[in-house]
Design a protein with these regions (language model features):
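Bacterial N-terminal signal peptides
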Residues: 8-17
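Beta-strand-rich recognition/accessory modules
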Residues: 757-863
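Catalytic and substrate-binding regions of extracellular carbohydrate-active enzymes
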Residues: 502-727, 819-823, 827-835, 842-850
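Aromatic-lined, polymer-binding surfaces characteristic
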Residues: 209-453, 459
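Long, low-complexity, polar/charged, intrinsically disordered or flexibly structured peripheral segments
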Residues: 123-210
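Carbohydrate-active enzyme catalytic cores, enriched for enzymes
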Residues: 410, 414-594, 819, 849-850, ...
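Polysaccharide-binding surfaces and accessory modules of carbohydrate-active proteins
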Residues: 698-777
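Non-catalytic terminal regions with compositionally biased, polar/charged low complexity
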Residues: 812-824, 830-1023
Length: 1023
């Protein structure tokens, strides 16, 4: 038969023990047992919803059952037929070029009936679709032009494996030009390894089809068949699935992506080139389902003589070894599929977030006493999955280091969510192998609880996940979280908060509270009844929030109405994957749209030029560029002020390491309500050091209107200069990774010189996503208050392969040019509907002893005559403000109506006085040092303080900021006052392991003895 390379080490030892004479062979399905299947059948008889689930499963599997066993067997392609996730992403379609770009990253569909030709359609057995042909969704041209299936069959060896050298080359011709003398006879012909277009460019259509259509279709078929078996106990579904799984076990030992990587084929492999069927980062999730499905159908294979007869016949016909018994077949699957998955983990050809879950599933599917337990033990070891992976990716690592203290993973957006969602699955996975009792995840890993709670905390307005880093789309909108998540969390923890979340996400419908496996339970409504009984009935209110290592904060209005609410968010995370160079990037939601839309996910990841030079660059974000280079966003940031005292919510975040050799890089932002429907934003960006400070903004449209300032059109070039063409990198040593990105800004207008006076820029929002109601006309108006050396407008492009993304956005760049710059950019953002509510904004004169760029006072005059005065100081400062206002602190706000003071707010301050109206405080903040920490109780992390807080200090629910050399944010909500200090409750103060190779050595902490602490106090006065 085949000569498979057997890897040395632990995986080989396990392989021998599984197949050895002392091993107890698998006896039963474990993930979905016979008892669970019986419950499903009973529930089908009792409940309409269960009967519909069964009917749906039967429908999904129908086409697969209709195929004969030989057809199924032939679906599985072998190693030498390449796989690729792109055809040619640089050139697009051979016929229409970049006309295909708006259709997404992976746009090709199966040729044939367009109504059936979705991205990953089954094609071999779906009537109306053409096997091994791809269709451009834009121009509808079909490639390749040859009959690849006939060629494929001619190239099979004795094992039924594809060998290109065996193929009949006479079959490799363009069917539209069958005459050998036709010059187009060989054009657009793909032998599996790509075709050449009329310009000599390579396009990899068959490899794309093999990856996206063929293998994805195989996995979907297995899912459908296994699910149908689990809900019917009909062995016909198990039979068909077993044919596929046995054949996969034939080909899988040879599967290796790296040879194709060396040939230029692409897949998701973190740049390593490694993988098995597909790239290593996606392989784990793909093969996990194969292992799960094998376990599910195992019971249905028992006693199936027809199955044995078929597989035995194919083995004899193709010299595949002895498969004359069910024991031989299941042994073959265990050795050549399940244990090959283990070997893939060992040699790192299987990576990604699913590795530990895959190992548990393999152990469960093997169901071999002793061996299965040892396989599961390995996921807790520092060396997992391999000593060749020096970082280690054990479950301990995931639940202590990778997952942040708030429950989100160490990457941006959807990537961070995937780590979190991966973590949540482990308790349920281990429950499927109850013989394993050596670890208790709920007791050992307190961050696990937070993974069930964090999704609502990540959102703005309970409606949208900010598009942080490589995530989301430009102006996209969408809620995350699901009732099923909170139901599962409640099942594990019996946590009141999770019951409340489940009830809210289910809109109070008990039927939506059924767990995902409800059909397999004896009483599927028991948990929904319990949740309905304990869920709270208090009105839900939004709150301002922040997450530490992830580095995202949200200030928002309290009413949970996305159409009327307003929210801002800031980015300041530390060491996040898929991060952009976006330190202190600002976002704003108002009037049901994204007013400062981040560009979101790039057209492609990897080394895609536009991704690095533009989409992920600093200049494309709403933040400050220094030295005309990108900032070092992943150096982290720290919150120094966080107050939510409606109608004012204010924060300050510092990112001192965003650039080398600077003294300050910090942003103060306040969200101020003027009514139930409108708020404005004060934005103060302070920076000291470096050259050329450029503050970039872009609004929700491709056009912008400037008032009070004349702009001059630059007829040629880009923002990089009139002689620099689009995307050009003219500088010495300039690359896509170090460029300023200025050459990606085009259609430039400039002020022609310094600007000293106040001006505005107005964007009328474009409705790209159907979010603007009839009769509404949202705008964003920016009030610029800072003298600068130049103002420029230019257009920049969002990724063009994301549905709903605009063609371009209009950027405002305010530049202060020079050496050793000291800047205080002061900007007011006014999101409004149809008619502005601000008449004018102006800087007020101030007198104080601090540096000029550390203090600012602004008057905001409303159309109705109301005047707000806002004062922002970098540090606590005594200030006299124009108009007889006295202030001593960091942030203050006064609202004056008809000449009378109506309200005051101040933070980290002791005095705010307007005439005879004063707000005074003896204690602007509590300050001191940390004397001890205690993280022994995962529900009560304690920090001792000197001096300790008075028992009656009004600080519970407020923020405590710790100042130390930890690069990530060290701000916590105070959950309780203790005798010696405070408690952060269940939000841990643990950072990571002291020694990643020895977990018993203990932990590093985010807070330590002698760290300085500050608890700013906040005060208000309403008249």
């Amino acid at each position: 038969m085949m000569n498979h390379l057997m890897l040395a080490g632990t995986a080989m030892i396990f392989a021998i023990s599984v197949m050895g004479g002392d091993a107890v062979a698998k006896q039963q399905s474990r993930a979905i047992t016979a008892e669970m299947r019986a419950n499903a059948l009973a529930n089908v008889e009792r409940y309409d919803w269960a009967a519909e689930q069964q009917s749906s499963a039967i429908r999904a599997a129908r086409a697969w059952v209709a195929m004969d066993d030989d057809e199924l067997w032939e679906l599985i392609t072998s190693q030498e037929l390449p796989r690729d996730i792109h055809t040619n992403k640089e050139l697009g379609c051979p016929n229409c070029g970049d006309g295909i770009v708006p259709y997404g990253n992976y746009p090709w569909t199966t040729a044939g009936d367009a109504s059936k030709a979705n991205l990953r359609s089954a094609s071999i057995h779906v009537e109306g679709l053409i096997p091994w042909k791809l269709r451009c969704p834009n121009c509808e041209e079909v490639y390749p032009k040859n009959d690849f299936w006939s060629y494929y069959q001619s190239a099979l060896d004795e094992h039924g494996f594809f060998r290109r050298e065996l193929g009949d080359e006479s079959l490799l011709y363009n069917e539209e030009h069958p005459d050998p003398d036709d010059p187009l006879h060989k054009l657009y012909v793909d032998d599996g390894y790509g075709l050449t277009d009329s310009d000599g460019n390579r396009h990899r259509f068959i490899a794309y089809y093999n990856s996206w259509m063929q293998w994805t279709n195989i996995r979907r078929g297995l899912d459908a068949l296994a699910h149908a078996y689990s809900l019917t106990s009909d062995p016909v579904y198990a039979h068909k699935a077993a044919v596929l799984i046995d054949r996969i076990a034939d080909v899988y030992p040879d599967m290796d992506f790296e040879p194709f990587h060396r040939m230029g084929f692409e897949h998701s492999h973190w740049g390593t080139g490694m993988g098995r069927i597909i790239g290593c980062s996606w392989e784990g999730g793909a093969v996990q389902r194969m292992a799960e499905n094998y376990d599910i159908i195992f019971d249905g294979m028992q006693g199936n003589e027809e199955l044995v007869a078929f597989i035995s016949r194919k083995a004899e016909e193709h010299n595949l070894g002895d498969k004359s018994s069910l024991e031989a077949i299941t042994g073959h699957i265990a050795e050549n599929m399940l244990m090959e998955f283990v070997r893939g983990l060992e040699d790192l050809r299987i990576r990604g977030r699913a590795r530990k879950a895959l190992m548990i599933v393999i152990a469960t599917a093997l169901d071999t006493p002793g061996v299965s337990e040892e396989l599961i033990d390995r996921i807790f070891e520092p060396g997992f999955p391999s000593e060749a992976d020096p970082d280690g990716r054990s479950l301990n690592w995931l639940l202590v280091e990778c997952i942040g203290r708030d429950g989100i993973g160490r990457e941006c957006g959807g990537y961070g969510l995937s780590w979190m969602r991966s973590a949540r699955q482990y308790p349920a996975l281990l429950e499927k192998y109850p013989e394993y009792t050596r670890r208790d995840l709920i007791a050992e890993f307190p961050k696990l609880r937070q993974t069930f709670l964090v999704e609502p905390r990540l959102m703005a307005l309970d409606a949208v996940l900010p598009p942080y880093g490589d995530s989301g789309s430009t102006g996209g909108w969408g809620r995350i979280g699901a009732a099923a998540t909170f139901v599962e969390g409640y099942r594990l923890y019996r946590d009141q908060r999770m019951a409340d979340l489940a009830w809210r996400y289910a809109d109070g419908d008990p039927a939506r509270l059924r767990p995902s496996n409800a059909i397999f339970l004896e009483d599927p409504d028991a948990l929904p009844r319990e949740i309905a009984a304990v869920a709270g009935d208090e009105d839900f209110r939004l709150r301002c929030d922040h997450l530490g290592r992830y580095g995202q904060l949200v200030l928002q209005t309290e009413e949970p109405d996305a159409a009327r609410g307003r929210a801002i968010w800031l980015a300041f995370g530390w060491a996040l994957g898929h991060r952009h160079a976006d330190a202190l990037n600002l976002g704003l939601y108002a009037h049901n749209i994204d007013m400062l839309p981040d560009l979101g996910y790039p057209e492609y990841t990897g080394a895609w030029p536009k991704r690095h030079a533009w989409t992920a660059n600093t200049i494309s974000h709403n933040t400050l560029v220094i030295n005309d280079v990108r900032n070092r966003a992943n150096s982290g940031g720290q919150i120094s002020l966080f107050a939510c005292e409606p109608p004012v919510r204010v924060t300050e975040v510092m990112a001192p390491d965003a650039y080398d050799d600077i003294d300050a890089y910090r942003r103060t932002v306040a969200l101020v309500d003027i009514s139930d429907d409108d708020s404005y934003v004060l934005d103060v960006f302070r920076a000291r050091g470096g050259t050329n400070h450029r503050l970039s903004y872009h609004g929700p449209a491709g056009a912008a209107t400037v008032e009070r300032l004349e702009m001059i059109e630059q007829p040629t070039g880009t923002f990089a200069g009139p002689d620099v063409e689009f995307a050009e990198l003219p500088g010495e040593g300039e690359t896509i990774r170090n460029t300023s990105g200025f050459s990606y800004l085009y259609d430039v207008e400039r002020s022609g010189g310094p600007v000293e006076s106040y001006y505005t820029v107005d964007w009328q929002a474009e409705d790209r996503r159907g979010r603007i109601a009839e009769g509404r006309q949202p705008h964003l108006r920016l009030h610029a208050l800072t003298p600068v050396d130049e103002v420029a407008l230019a257009s920049g492009d969002p990724p063009q392969n994301r549905a709903g993304n605009p063609r371009s956005l209009r950027y405002l760049i305010q530049s202060r040019i020079g050496e050793e710059m000291q800047s205080q950019f002061v900007t007011m953002l006014e999101p409004y509907d149809t008619t502005p509510f601000i008449s004018e904004v102006r800087l007020l004169e101030t007198e104080h002893a601090a540096a000029a760029e550390t203090v600012v006072a602004v008057a905001v005059e409303m159309i109705d005559g109301t005047v707000d005065i806002l004062i922002s100081c970098e540090e606590r400062t005594r200030v006299e403000v124009e108009g007889g206002i006295e202030f001593d602190g960091r942030f203050g706000m006064v609202r004056i109506e008809n000449g009378d003071v109506r309200l005051m707010r101040m933070s980290d301050a002791s005095l705010l006085r307007v005439g005879d109206v004063a707000l005074e405080a003896e204690q602007p903040a509590w300050e001191g040092v940390v004397t001890a920490i205690n993280a022994d109780d995962p529900a009560d992390h304690r920090i001792s303080l000197d001096p300790p807080l008075p028992p009656d200090a009004d600080v519970v629910g407020r923020r405590i900021h710790f100042h130390n050399d930890v690069p990530k944010d060290t701000t916590w909500v105070i959950e309780a006052i203790t005798e010696t200090g405070i408690s952060t409750g269940e939000i841990t103060i643990i950072w990571d392991f002291l020694d990643s190779s020895d977990y018993a050595a203990g932990f590093r902490y985010l807070v330590n003895e002698d760290d300085r602490f500050v608890i700013p106090n906040h005060f208000g006065l309403d008249r």
